[in-house]
Amino acid sequence: MELVLLILVASLIGIAFLALQQHYSYWRRMGVREIRPKWIVGNLMGLLNMRMSPAEFISQLYNHPDAENEPFVGIHVFHKPALLLRDPEMVRNILVKDFAGFSNRYSSSDPKGDPLGSQNIFFLKNPAWKEVRLKLSPFFTGNRLKQMFPLIEEVGASLDAHLRQQPLHNERMRCFDLEAKELCALYTTDVIATVAYGVSANSFTDPKCEFRRHGRSVFEFNLLRAAEFTLVFFLPHLVPFVRFKVVPAEATRFLRKTINYVMSEREKSGQKRNDLIDILIEFRRSTQLAKASGIKDQFVFEGDILVAQAVLFFTAGFESSSSTMAFAMYELAKDTDVQQRLREEIKDALVESGGQVTLKMIESLEFMQMILLEVLRMYPPLPFLDRECTSGRDYSLAPFHKKFVVPKGMPVYIPCYALHMDPQYFPQPRKFLPERFSPENRKLHTPYTYMPFGLGPHGCIGERFGYLQAKVGLVNLLRNHMITTSERTPHRMQLDPKAIITQAKGGIHLRLVRDALGV
């Protein structure tokens, strides 16, 4: 009996071994160059052991010797075969030219357990994504941004006042130290609160206010949160079973209550502010009218689908811009010549505008734009993009591969950070060189190698808004202060291995010196 049991166990182990060997030989059988995976974890060991940031992990795959000179390479995300793109023309095909066959992200959250995370425009799948994107687009037109500008600058002026009120740590040097990311997050939180919701968060006077506290909770990465986001992007089918929420439960309750209250009060008063709340109210009215008229098959804009868009605008809006501003402060602190040139540009523009920060004045800052473009090359908010093949038939990769076709459901990853740091596209990639993005040099860039906000129809809908609030914030910061390094400033930036988005490990500690431009 024991011998029979032993033979049975050995047989089962042997069958499992052969099955795994067959499974993980997928790319060899398809005739596709692969990066050899490890069983169970696939090619994700570098991410799972948290010895490197997601940006560095994706670069390691991109630069792997087995991927050299290949337009794409086969990888495994845990058990599942996936494609990692390396050729800019393939990036164009997947993100733009053949978007219809890759219109969904592979990543997703749990529709039941995480309604505000799963139903926002970032995670929504077609056709719901297309409907929501179409409805939200008017909020980000040039005319809308023009209407928003006074509200953004009002918060910018509060940032300037907040900094001028800070006690000096050294009277002789007229300076004080701070953590740049937190300062910038206070600013962007207040901007989003007033521009999107029509409320004052007052983060500068109360850094622990509910808006800031709940915003922080979404992007505060510990070991558990890191593991959960890894599932969202690489093993999304397991997310419902682990009950992970992109938007934590407490933040969900606060934001749902706040947004529904603001919408209700706005409808009662009839007031119009041309903000996101007005757009969401119009969404709801269109659904109500359609129901009253007996119109069927119209996408339903009500309940959490409305709140989810407001939540995404809040969380993504404050996080990406505050990170960009903080990384810009870090690079400016290390490069005094670039900072001096920028401050001179700001001073000249302020003189031209009579000392007022206006939309025209902000739009005239060409060197500021070059700096932000270079910062976003070095520190893109998301280090990679993900797509899922949604084509009704297998997608051919010709002329890049004559035989292999991408099956429906296969994940595809675009390594933004790795492309940004590839010396064949951006020489001396680790060096901060805003001149890369001068109007003349931009024309020389290889298309589809720069994508800090994504590309194609799925590109970030709030990109122009993000640039605008970052520029207003930096102008008000540099108007009366110069940025320098301190004893706590790292010589080389280290990215947080726990954060799926691009964040500095341990914060960005800098020093501000009182030095008014005199305008």
From Swiss-Prot:
This protein's name: Probable cytochrome P450 6g2
CDD domains associated with the record: CYP6-like
Species name: Drosophila melanogaster (Fruit fly)
Cofactors required: heme
One Gene Ontology biological process: response to DDT
The entry's keywords: Endoplasmic reticulum, Heme, Iron, Membrane, Metal-binding, Microsome, Monooxygenase, Oxidoreductase
Binding site for heme: 460
Membrane topology: Peripheral membrane protein
Localisation per UniProt entry: Endoplasmic reticulum membrane; Microsome membrane
Enzyme nomenclature, EC number: 1.14.-.-
